[in-house]
Amino acid sequence: MRRVLKIGHRGAAGHAPENTLAAIRKGIELGVDFVEIDVRCTADGSLIALHDATVNRTTDGKGPIDRLSLLDVKALDAGNGERVPMLEEVLRVVSGQAGLMLELKVKGAAQKAVEAVQKAEFKGPLIYASFLHEELGIIRSVDAEASLMALFGRLPQASVARAMKYSPSHVGLRHDTVTRRLVEAFHDEDLLVFVYTTDTIREIQRAISAGVDGIISNVPERLRW
């Protein structure tokens, strides 16, 4: 029987502050196949795990992340006393424990992310994901074997065609856009299909019925197989 991969969204954001080491460790504890985190750059070029363009929602600070230094970010509380981790810290925690999915949120992150992964000698499967498909192209140009996931919100045909130029191995789709026919069409192109962010039992069952290969969830303990 086909096994659907379990991916912890922002670690396991249903259990601990998103994108923190606590959330990541919880995802690993819950047995995920992959931990997914978001990657952004600070003003001084450091890669950190953060979803939004500002720190307002997820920390006790304010301001755009691209105007804050790493030192500024390290002083912030990301919830429950957790800090915003650097990518290097994430790589150390996940290496050898689970796979890692890095969602690149900004232009210019791709090359730095590849260098950080190589420097860390990360052990385990790794997927680079992005809605910024040109960033995936940068990674493909330096690593022909990298696993790349082209993320989509809606699916205009032109956007799909542009993304395919970068030879992704995976596509990431909104759970409410997925149908069996769509999944089969991507499978016919030798692409694996993951869905996000799939939290309710009904959403999970629908994704499985559509034939997806991976489910990204804030509550991965609901992925019971």
Where are the regions a protein language model picked out?
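Phosphate-group recognition and catalysis centered on beta-loop-alpha active-site segments
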Residues: 1-225
